[in-house]
Amino acid sequence: MSRKVFYISDGTAITAEVFGHAVLSQFPVEFEALTIPFVETTQKAEAVKAQINDCFITTGERPLVFHSIVKAEIRDIIYSSECIDYDFLNTFVAPLEDQLGVKAVPVTHRTHGKANHSYEARIDAINYAMENDDGQTLKHIDKADIVLLGVSRCGKTPSSLYLSMQFGIKAANYPFIEDDMDNLKLPEVLKKNKHKLFGLTIDPVRLHEIRQSRMENSRYSSLRQCRIEVKEVEMMYKRERIPFVNTTNHSVEEIATKILDVTGLERHMF
């Protein structure tokens, strides 16, 4: 039987989910998770408490509760439920107050709320990533923080969007297709922005599997074509001295972090 887990917050619950998942992923146990955001009133907190208690009665095990609740009166209600409680905010707030010599000023939604310049930067970056996805236009490449290159289905779009949503980075991406392979070279506009270029590559077998799910038994998805494209693109990266990373078996979070590590790009979100 899987262990029940609750992620609870008086905001989006993203912080509780991220921290909780990072901890639980270390254990070879199956977890059944429920996320409950915007628990902003004592009435909502009482309803969540009842839900937790029902879970305990049903399973015979106290569920794990990861939360990032700012208001003390709401936290106290969750504390009083039949749960194993992990309070991320309070775990760090008191020691930091001692070190900084300043009392915390609790504000709901501060972590993932609308925060002036940071929020606007993220929205601008997301819009930019969508408008400059898959080589739709090269008119605004000069405004990019980074331009991701690669063959079709190697992870360019999700990586671009993650960089924009998570870090406020303006990421364009440009695909190399079958027709490019006979004489593969960078378009002039990309050559002029070579310092912004970053390549993605992928294992040909994995690329074949991904393309098969999209266009089964086509030339585009054939293992032979995948091998040709990956080989040609990697040779071009090396020839042009473009840094690149292999996306095979890596999550979009890992890919984005590797890109930031290699390029030294500044995060705009925090």
UniProtKB/Swiss-Prot annotation:
Instruction: Give the EC class as a word.
Output: transferase
The protein's Enzyme Commission number: 2.7.11.33, 2.7.4.28
Q: Provide the reaction this enzyme catalyses.
A: [pyruvate, water dikinase] + ADP = [pyruvate, water dikinase]-phosphate + AMP + H(+); [pyruvate, water dikinase]-phosphate + phosphate + H(+) = [pyruvate, water dikinase] + diphosphate
Write out the entry's keywords from A to Z: Kinase, Nucleotide-binding, Serine/threonine-protein kinase, Transferase
Could you tell me the superkingdom of the organism this chain comes from? Bacteria
> In which residues is ADP bound?
150-157
Which is a Pfam family this sequence falls into? Kinase-PPPase
An example molecular function term from Gene Ontology annotations: phosphotransferase activity, phosphate group as acceptor
InterPro entries per record: Kinase-pyrophosphorylase, PSRP
The family assignment reads: Belongs to the pyruvate, phosphate/water dikinase regulatory protein family. PSRP subfamily.
Function description: Bifunctional serine/threonine kinase and phosphorylase involved in the regulation of the phosphoenolpyruvate synthase (PEPS) by catalyzing its phosphorylation/dephosphorylation.
Question: Under what name is this protein listed?
Answer: Putative phosphoenolpyruvate synthase regulatory protein
